Amino acid sequence: MDNQSSYDSMMGFMAREETRTRTVTSPRTGTPEGRTLTGPATRAWTMRLLVLGIVLTALNLRPAITSLGALLEEVRDGLGMSGSVAGLLTSVPPLCFAVFGVTAPRLARRFGPGTVVCAGMAAITAGLLIRPYTGSTAGFLAASALALMGIAVSNVLMPVIVKRWFPDRVGSMTGLYSMALALGTASAAAVTVPMTEVLGGSWQTGLAVWAGLAAAAVLPWIPFVRDRGAAPADSGQEQHARVDAPPLRITRSRTSWALAVYFGLQATGAYITMGWMAQIFRDAGVHAGTAGLLLAVTMVMGVPLAFVIPRLAGRLPHQGPIVLALGACGLAGYAGLYLAPAAGSWAWAVLLGVSNCSFPLALTMVGMRARTSAGVAQLSGFAQSTGYLLSIPGPLLVGVLYQHSGGWGLPIALMAGLMIPQMAVGVLAGRDRTVEDEAAR
């Protein structure tokens, strides 16, 4: 299913719901957790705008990273970076996601999720526009951190928004969001190099142009900015956007820890892939444009699969079999990169693309492992922040191993080795239970 048909299908669902009035009741408190939606025209407009905001937000959550991966060699030469510093650069995304992502639930309680996501999109716009023209490695890192801060809070709040606005369509909406995220990731990887050549060959221009897409994503969230997390019960527009944290000790839950480690290991593999895979192919003799296209193939595999996997996962009581299947594809892809990186490059790109769909699976499990949207907010913040913190050393270590070994054998062996514990904790995270029950015990 392509992106347009998926969007049309979701719009059809919204249209069928226009004449209904629904209140979502919290199992924890017994009180309405969502808003009672009245006024078919207002509801239809709000829901369509929200879906547009979710899709545009998802499109902007990876181009800041994959566009840099496609031009990493040019950026290194232009700023005089060593291999170790470049490895540090590829570790900045998970570091920012860990540091800033943990603040997202608190910010959402105070200002409302819509306000925070709108500010996040503005931060991405500013960071992408500034970073190519700072003229130094330190400035480049600082501007990248600004953009990644916006990505971090939006990463955490997307499952919360899906759970609150679409509690009976978590799998479908997560699939739509994940599919748009994969599309943005793949597009940046595929078109950054040729677009840079068309625009005159300057890597600065090739990176800065992605600020335009981020600016477009600010607009749908502006109507949701007026909520400050304290709307009266009859306000109708944003009552349910407030995220009240439950009295839940999330660290008592084994599932929350398993999900956090799974999130961290899949993020490690994903950011190593986005930051280094194009360089692996280039070092194997593949042309720079083709290497970027191969990275795009890896990313674009997530477009259809990111829609299918969450829906399939939502229908299964245990997501372990999906975890194992994705892990097996990753192991096969790494083996191919090690043995014949250039000869079978397209096959390895496809296999690693399938394996990278662990990300939408992890997001789906976040939505399924908690009963309430407040629980999802806390679980999402914990799993993503802890997971991204765990993923920080991976890309940096790959850069160090590459520089000191003079080849890709050791880095690829590291990537393959990390896939084994990822599969193990993924099976644990996929068990049919909730963090509320585990924390209570």
PLM region spans:
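Helix-breaking motifs and short loop linkers at transmembrane-helix boundaries and internal kinks
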Residues: 80, 112, 133-138, 167, ...
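A late C-terminal transmembrane helix in Major Facilitator Superfamily
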Residues: 370-408, 415
